[in-house]
A protein has these predicted regions:
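Active-site-adjacent structural elements that line small-molecule/cofactor binding pockets in enzymes
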Residues: 1-300
Length: 300
């Protein structure tokens, strides 16, 4: 799928959700259908040591009619390149091109938990793309071919996303990173960062919830802290689940307008699409927050 067509298809606002693989299928289907009904253009989700992205993508595609479903990301260590190529072709052909294959090298602790050996991520992703391009496939072919994007944080992975994929899907980033990413990608490739959001206006409460439900976990992963160091953060920001400065930079908390401003900062920095991740502090999958935000982010 041409890059401009992909950006047009998914629109300017999507949803990133980490909980859809951890609930009964019926609950995930209802959530996906409502996210589509609210008008979000894409539904992104990750892959953990306890979930599998391709089967979840099929479930979400079957539950919806228009929204693009995107792996954000599928871990390259979980399945070989031929399997990823076949899965992407199958899903894109069966669901009218609504599937986007987001790929990434994940993180050493998560790869090790699956019994694999983590290797140099840039070389590993490049070799994986080579193998995908050479992989045979005997089923019906999607036309246009399924789009693929890369989880890219550092300059060299962003260059690979520019040269070998439709674009980049950075996670756990700031608008400053989005600006740097756009500079490397250039004008054409898709840039679709994730942005965590939390509708809570009390600073102490918001930061506490953000640490509990988001930053504390990700600050244990060296790829993210390495990227944050490039953005000017240091060890003092990584302790205790994140300094106030770091939490405020990573999580857009406050009222609806505060979230709108942060999303606009990403767009102003060069993002084509921003995937908001509602921090589900109430065990309700954050759907209530998505309902409140949709009229402002999508229609506003």
């Amino acid at each position: 799928m041409p890059q401009h067509a992909l950006a047009s298809r998914i629109g300017r606002i999507g949803v990133w959700h980490g909980g859809l693989g951890q609930v009964p299928g019926a609950v995930a289907r209802r959530a996906a259908a409502e996210i589509e009904q609210l008008g979000y253009g894409a539904l992104w989700f990750g892959e953990t040591p306890a979930t599998e992205s391709m089967s979840l993508a099929g479930l979400l595609l079957a539950a919806t009619e228009r929204i693009t479903v995107a792996t954000g990301i599928a871990n390259i260590w979980v399945r070989d390149a031929s399997a990823a190529h076949a899965a992407a072709q199958t899903l894109a052909e069966a669901y009218d091109g609504r599937f986007v294959l987001g790929l990434g090298a994940s993180h050493a602790p998560l790869v090790d938990a699956r019994g694999h050996r983590y290797a140099k991520p840039l070389a590993a992703v490049r070799a994986y793309l080579d193998a995908m391009d050479a992989a045979p496939y005997e089923g019906p072919v999607a036309d246009p071919p399924p789009a693929r994007v890369l989880a890219a944080l550092g300059p060299k992975m962003l260059e690979l996303a520019r040269d070998r994929a439709a674009g980049a899907h950075p996670y756990f980033v700031t608008p400053e990173h989005t600006a740097r990413a756009r500079e490397i990608l250039g004008a054409g490739p898709l840039l679709a960062p994730e942005q965590a959001v939390l509708l809570e206006s009390d600073p102490a409460t918001a930061r506490s919830l953000a640490r509990e439900h988001h930053t504390r976990f990700y600050l244990e992963l060296p790829n993210y802290t390495g990227n944050l160091r490039r953005l000017g953060f240091g060890d003092e920001d990584f302790a205790g689940g994140g300094s106030d400065r770091l939490v405020d930079a990573i999580v857009a908390w406050g009222d609806v307008d505060a979230v709108r401003r942060r999303v606009q900062e990403h767009h102003d920095a060069g993002a084509d699409h921003v995937a908001i991740q509602p921090l589900a502090t109430d065990r309700g999958l954050g759907i209530g927050q998505l309902r409140e935000l949709a009229p402002v982010l999508i229609d506003g």
